[in-house]
């Protein structure tokens, strides 16, 4: 899982900038709205909404914004109707891309995504062209300062831990079955262990290692996609060589 850990590290470094752009709140609002639309506005019976609300609060979203997003999803307030569409394709160095969107205009969205990918000499593929390379998993970034590795493993093994990556300097990257994500969060909460960004990710079965030039191009491509208004999240099977990591850090 080292490739996933390295990419998670890079994405965390981008997070502060993304929040300044306002992108983060926009994505969170759309996720809350869609979750409420699909499963109702009561988080106790809607796990997806519960997770979206946890992430919104962790990022200091005002309660007023949260409630308005829920009510738009349930139809209690008028608002834009979003549909979820997933696109698949390839980027620099042959990396696979899964692009999840929430849009009110699919023609605009696919045109924007195709333009961004083509600009990087990538290509947009058919549905299923790369998704077979990935599996959806629950992921939690646990602060290393809040628990030792052995303690964390002991706590999470009972909650269904599948993998624990320790490569990052600040965080353990926990991989768990989606159905066990909430029980893992509860186990951490019960022990007072601090974590960030509990989420569902698409984890690749295998990684494509990129050298410096392609790595820089790939990160710029993913950054451009994630800054597109309709894109919620981008998954890839990037692995970075040591030289590439140094180039990205510089």
Curated annotation (Swiss-Prot):
Primary location group? cytoplasm
Keyword set includes NAD: no
Which terms in the Gene Ontology molecular function aspect does this entry carry? Answer: DNA binding
A single GO BP annotation from the record?
Answer: regulation of DNA-templated transcription
Q: Which InterPro entries match?
A: Integrase-like_N, TACO1_YebC-like_2nd/3rd_dom, TACO1_YebC_N, Transcrip_reg_TACO1-like, Transcrip_reg_TACO1-like_dom3, YebC-like
Pfam families linked: TACO1_YebC_N, Transcrip_reg
> Which locations, inside or outside the cell, does it occupy?
Cytoplasm
**Keyword vocabulary terms for this entry:** Cytoplasm, DNA-binding, Transcription, Transcription regulation
Q: Where would you find the membrane-spanning parts of this chain? A: none
A GO cellular component annotated for this chain's UniProt record is: cytosol
Q: Which family does it belong to?
A: Belongs to the TACO1 family.
What is the protein's name according to its record?
Answer: Probable transcriptional regulatory protein Paes_0496
Q: Which organism is it from?
A: Prosthecochloris aestuarii (strain DSM 271 / SK 413)
Print the organism lineage.
Answer: Bacteria, Pseudomonadati, Chlorobiota, Chlorobiia, Chlorobiales
